[in-house]
Amino acid sequence: MKKLVSILMAAVLLLCAVPVLAEGQTYTVGVCQLVTHDALDAATQGFIDALNEALPGQVKIVEKNASGDSVNCSTIVNGFVSDGVDLIMANATPALTAAASATSDIPILGTSITAYGVALDMDDFTGTVGGNISGTSDLADLE
């Protein structure tokens, strides 16, 4: 259930951005996923499917897997920044942390992030990250 909610939230965030995109333009999206795992794979695939449905033929996806190594996340997202991608999707906390450190200009969507405040070292986190970062959490509502 958490997996489905995360995928749906990522799709909603994406679809909110669609009206501001120029028709006929191609966008490059870098996807950095920490490790191969069923839940992370499903979140990434749901994101890619939503992008391709919303912008058929307009999105080039560059998908990279860090093989469980946070140093690889940094290398991957720094490559995305150097390549000038239009959006970074960071799947898992180390990927988000690396992306946040790599750029304050390129929009970043995080998914499968348990605690944004902890991931981004924000002591005064109120539920909104601000800046160039947004996304979904995999933290279960315990109420």
Question: Which residues fall in each region the model found?
Answer:
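Hydrophobic alpha-helical segments within soluble ligand-binding/sensing domains
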Residues: 116-143
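Alpha-helical structural signal in soluble globular domains
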Residues: 46-54, 98-102
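Short, low-complexity disordered leader/linker segments with a strong preference
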Residues: 1-28, 52-56
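Residues that mark the start of a beta-strand
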Residues: 26-30, 107, 132-135
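Extracytoplasmic "Venus flytrap"
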Residues: 27-48, 62-73
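A structural micro-motif
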Residues: 57-59, 106, 131
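Beta-alpha junction/loop-to-helix N-cap segments that form part of ligand/metal-binding clefts
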Residues: 65-124
